């Protein structure tokens, strides 16, 4: 039984945002918070996978950021990381607060959609 879960945080950002800045900011904050603990979790995960018939997957050792198109209005900026289930909510809340604080500090680089449909 695998003792961790993959968790995600998603923000909607405008197409005109500085996507490199958004990705770097989200990744850096997640790495600062999770650090070596995530590396250990990934090692455990890959060891467990090696004992299964599942083909070798590429498992990232650090938090990763991906972007997805969300309709015609904005992009989803998503950071993925590995966490213990009991800590998931607390860590997610802490990460969201820190990410929003840093992203909001650069309003010319991080443009959030100006709509009530968020």
Residue ranges and their predicted role:
Residues 1-118:
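Structured, soluble regulatory/oligomerization domains located on the cytosolic or IMS-facing side
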């Amino acid at each position: 039984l695998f003792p961790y879960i993959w968790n995600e945080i998603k923000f909607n950002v405008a197409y005109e945002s500085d996507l490199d800045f958004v990705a770097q900011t989200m990744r850096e904050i997640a790495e600062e918070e999770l650090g070596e603990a995530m590396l250990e979790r990934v090692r455990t995960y890959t060891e467990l996978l090696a004992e299964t018939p599942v083909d070798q997957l590429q498992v990232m050792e650090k938090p990763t950021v991906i972007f997805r198109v969300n309709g015609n209005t904005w992009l989803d900026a998503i950071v993925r990381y590995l966490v213990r289930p009991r800590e998931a909510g607390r860590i997610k809340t802490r990460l969201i607060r820190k990410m929003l604080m840093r992203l909001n500090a650069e309003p010319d680089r991080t443009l959030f959609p100006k709509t009530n449909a968020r």
